[in-house]
Structures are given as C-alpha cells and as structure tokens.
Amino acid sequence: MMKIAATLLATIALATVNALDNGLALTPQMGWSSWNFYACNINESVIMNTAKAMVSNGMADAGYTYVNIDDCWAGGRYPNGTVYADPTNFPNGIKYVADYIHSLGLKIGIYTDAGTETCQKRVGSYGYEANDAQTYAEWGIDYVKEDWCYATLENPQQRYQIMSQALNATGRPMFFSLCDWGYENPWTFGMSVGNSWRTTPDIKDNWDSMLSNLMAQAPITSFSGIGGFNDPDMMMVGNGGMSNTEYVSHFSLWSLLNAPLIAGCDLIDIDQETLSILTASEVIAINQDPLGVQGSLVKSYNGGLQQIWAKPLSNGARAVVLFNTDTNPATIELLWGNIWMEPSQQLSIRNLWTQTNLGTFTESYESDSLIPPHGCIMLTLTPTN
C-alpha cells in the first residue's frame, strides 16, 4: 500500500509544479470552438447565435464558458500594425461580438498563429505579439489560441513565451492555448508558458482518429495539472462521423483525461442525444474535479482491446472508465490494486451515465453486463469509511 500511495502522490506532485501563474486553468477549460463544424464559414451571426444557444440549451449552465472564434476571422492589419476583423463577416468588429457574449455571462476566445500567417493564410502574430495582445485586451478577449502554421523553423517554446509574456503584460487575464500539434513535445514546456497545449495532430470525426489521440495521452499524463492541461484536441461529439456509443466513450475519456471540454458541433441546431452527452453532469464533474490529476491508463487486457483508465478525485474516490475498443462485446474486471486501493477496502460504486448506485464491493468489480463494441462504463468508486 505504501508503494501505491507513493506513486499516487508523485503523480499529483508532478502535476502541480512550474505552472504559468496567470490565475487561470484551475480546472480544464470548457466551451465551444467554431472550427470543427464551420471551418472558415464563420461570421458574427454564427458566433453570436451560438453563444445565445449555449445559454438557452443548458450548455452554459453545465459549465461551458468560452465561445471561441477559430481561424478565418482576421481581415488584415492597418498601417500601424493593428489587426482588424474581416469587414464582410464581422462588420461590427470583434469587440461588438465580445460585448454581446459577455452580456450573456459567457467569455470569448480568439485565434491567432505564431507564424507570419494562420493555417488559412490570414495574418499571423509573428513579430506583432505585443500589438495583438494589447488589441485583444482592448476588445475584451478572454482566451487566445495560438496555432503553429508557417512557424516551423522557430523554437516553439521561445515563440510561445513571447506571446505568453505579451498577454500577461496587458493586465487582462487571458487563457493561453498552445497548438503545435504535439510535434515538439509541448508537454515538456507548456506548463511554464500556457494553460493548455495540443498533444496530437488535428482530430478527425472518426473512431480511429479519436482512439489515436486518446492513446497518445498515455505516456504523458504526469505533465498535466492545475494551471495547465494536455489537450488531445476539441471534441467531435455530435458531428455525425461516429456512433453515439463511440461519442459517449469519447466524452467519458476526455473527461477522465482532464482534457479541455471544447465542443465542436452545431450548437444552434443540436439534437437532444448529443446535448445529453455534452451536458452529462456527473461525467463533467470528473473533468472539473479540483484535485486536477489527469486520468491514466492503468490496465490493458487482450492486447489493449479492453482498457481501464482511472484517476484519483479530491474526495478520496476514484473515477474509472472501463473501455472496450474491440468490435465485439466484452466484460472487464477491475482490481482495487489497479486504482491505488487496498483489496480489503470497501468501495461504493456508482455508474455515472445511468446515475445509479451499483452497491458496495471489495477486492474487485466486473462489469455486470457486456460492454458494447467501442463502448464504455464510467464509474466512481468511493471508500465507505
């Protein structure tokens, strides 16, 4: 038991040092981004109506705070270097949109690039970091995502440090999201310059892409913690490329990983099943647990076809996802040793998706029904004493 406790304490300690001290990212960020569904087809109406929908459909009440404008908003720069919005799609400017979003009690995010151009060839922030940061502050921006297109000859830690310092110098707290797609191991330096850092290439709306981005997190869980989080990319839940069973697994695992919960579907015309996944309160609570420890892969069976992912919670409980990656149904057995518990410990188990208590167990728990192909069961296990 002492060895198990020492391992757990070491994980927590590694996850809470060297954080960028801007007072943000005490828990993973939650919100919505325009890219996955709209790509470049954005305008002020889309952004403002999405924000309005987040309030009316319960997303805001569930914790989704940020409304993030991704690439294609920028129109260019004035002669003095100040960036301005595309006058066709954002005729009233970004501050107008920001003021509206703030009036709803939400926050606004903006996109830029560490290179000379963004990925869609709009103006990047290279050499204009201080100018852009001040402009964002004047607009009332709360969140900045900085991409890595046309910056590949640069050192990402140094380049991102420039924008990080520029944002902090404005005096306005702005969440800083780094995005070099994991190419230069940003988890090794991200905590010192940003609040989250992409660890993978862009996610696609299919099973293989989601699974690939998930598995890329397994070796780097100790680099995430309060103040800065590993980012396996925005969620694809609701975009139609996967089944709802797969989307439940996607959302469960992103929640357990302390990944940013950034929705990427159409929230204006969202279906009820997608909304119920994205607003699952007991699942979201695992992501937002204040202990801030990222979940990790603790056990695999059958060559990785069945997996157990787990994380400790602030109340002494454990959150667990029993994950079946196989194309056939399966049962999965969880041993207490897998989750840093003594075999004799009595644990009360709750299913977070059905919101039902399953009883009290010692030593182990085996799923009482077959887990469907690409499906999961998400549990909390709480000591009875």
Swiss-Prot record:
Location of the active site: 147 (nucleophile), 202 (proton donor)
Top-level taxonomic group: Eukaryota
InterPro entries, per the entry: Aldolase_TIM, Glyco_hydro_27, Glyco_hydro_b, Glycoside_hydrolase_SF, Melibiase_C
Signal peptide (residue range): 1-19
Record Gene3D superfamilies: Aldolase class I, Golgi alpha-mannosidase II
Pfam families for the chain: Melibiase_2, Melibiase_C
One BP term from GO: carbohydrate metabolic process
EC number: 3.2.1.22
Binding of substrate, residues: 180-184
Covalent S-S links between cysteines: 40-72, 119-149
Claim: Chloroplast is one of the keywords in the record: no
Record's keyword annotation contains Signal: yes
Reaction catalysed by this enzyme: Hydrolysis of terminal, non-reducing alpha-D-galactose residues in alpha-D-galactosides, including galactose oligosaccharides, galactomannans and galactolipids
GO molecular function: alpha-galactosidase activity
Keyword annotations from UniProtKB, A to Z: Carbohydrate metabolism, Disulfide bond, Glycosidase, Hydrolase, Signal
Family indicated by similarity: Belongs to the glycosyl hydrolase 27 family.
PANTHER family: ALPHA-GALACTOSIDASE MEL1, ALPHA-GALACTOSIDASE/ALPHA-N-ACETYLGALACTOSAMINIDASE
Protein name: Probable alpha-galactosidase
Organism of derivation: Dictyostelium discoideum (Social amoeba)
Gene: melA
